[in-house]
Regions:
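Membrane-proximal interfacial segments on either side of biological membranes
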Residues: 1-292
Length: 292
């Protein structure tokens, strides 16, 4: 542990320069799917200045084995929300496999993100959620241009992830993004403003299973295409989920009874291949954390 602290009485601020060993600390960063257990060698070098209203991190360098996070000129408010930054460089591994390798730069109101890999599971789960714990402050705005060679969602890889977006007052206001599972299978995501506070999220995926991990009532799922639409604001959302041409091995008893009305349904059950469905259509509303 090495530290240098300087107090500026006139401006009521404090400058700091720390070199910290974090071996005994456990560290978890959800949005990067990064998890360091205690008693693993790691180091944090950080310098900057703070007062009662803000924290400015001039340089941050975190390292642990082959994991590294570098941040330059990060400005935070007194709620530790991001007001601005110059650069964020991330390289992290999980089970000795690289899952994040990207570089984000901000120049005035333009944000450029490029890299080889990005673990996007957490990002997609939060697309239409306006959490109380906000990453960006109301002062943060900018136009985003991104291109990443590979993204990972629920342990599945997609390629050539690219698009444009816009952040206004700390919230994702617009987004168009595309990626490829293969030459003829795509993922398409968009967020468009509908009114002053309401937005529309649209997702189309040629592989539906990727987005069904959290639906506990659907098990043994295979095949299928997915189309998801959600109109939402910071209080509630109205959503529609459609899935086409898929099979499910474990389904509620009512679905089995209905499927047995067809000869194909009997054949599917006898072979153990699962029950075939042409289309699944579900509407649901959320108010806060509650689904209706």
């Amino acid at each position: 542990f090495i530290s240098k602290t300087t107090f500026d009485i006139e401006n009521n601020s404090t400058a700091f320069d720390y070199d910290l060993d974090l071996d005994s600390s456990s560290i978890k960063i959800d949005n990067l799917n990064y998890d360091k257990p205690a008693n693993k060698k790691s180091n944090l070098k950080i310098s900057g200045i703070f007062d009662k209203n803000k924290l400015v991190v001039n340089n941050l360098n975190y390292s642990e084995s082959k994991n590294n996070i570098l941040i330059k000129n990060l400005h935070l408010n007194n709620k530790y929300q991001v007001n601005n930054f110059d650069q964020i460089l991330v390289n992290t591994l999980k089970d000795n496999i690289i899952i994040n390798n990207f570089n984000a730069k901000k120049n005035e109101n333009k944000i450029f993100v490029s890299g080889n890999k990005f673990e996007a599971t957490y990002f997609l789960k939060k697309l239409n959620k306006d959490n109380k714990r906000k990453t960006f402050s109301k002062e943060f705005s900018g136009n985003i241009d991104f291109k990443v060679k590979e993204i990972i969602i629920n342990k599945e890889s997609l390629f050539n992830f690219s698009g444009l977006g816009q952040i206004q007052e700390g919230k994702l206001h617009k987004l168009t993004a595309k990626a490829n599972f293969s030459d003829n299978e795509i993922l398409d995501i968009s967020i468009t403003p509908v009114s002053l506070n309401k937005k529309k999220l649209f997702i189309f995926s040629d592989r539906a299973k990727l987005f069904l991990e959290d639906y506990k009532f659907i098990k043994g799922f295979s095949g299928g295409k997915l189309e998801y639409t959600s109109n939402y604001d910071n209080k509630a959302s109205k959503s529609n989920l459609k899935i086409y041409d898929f099979k499910v091995k474990n389904v509620p008893i009512l679905a089995k009874i209905l499927t047995l009305a067809s000869l194909q349904g009997v054949a599917d059950l006898l072979t153990g291949e699962g029950i075939r469905f042409n289309e699944f259509d579900m509407n649901f509303n959320t108010v806060g954390p509650k689904i209706e």
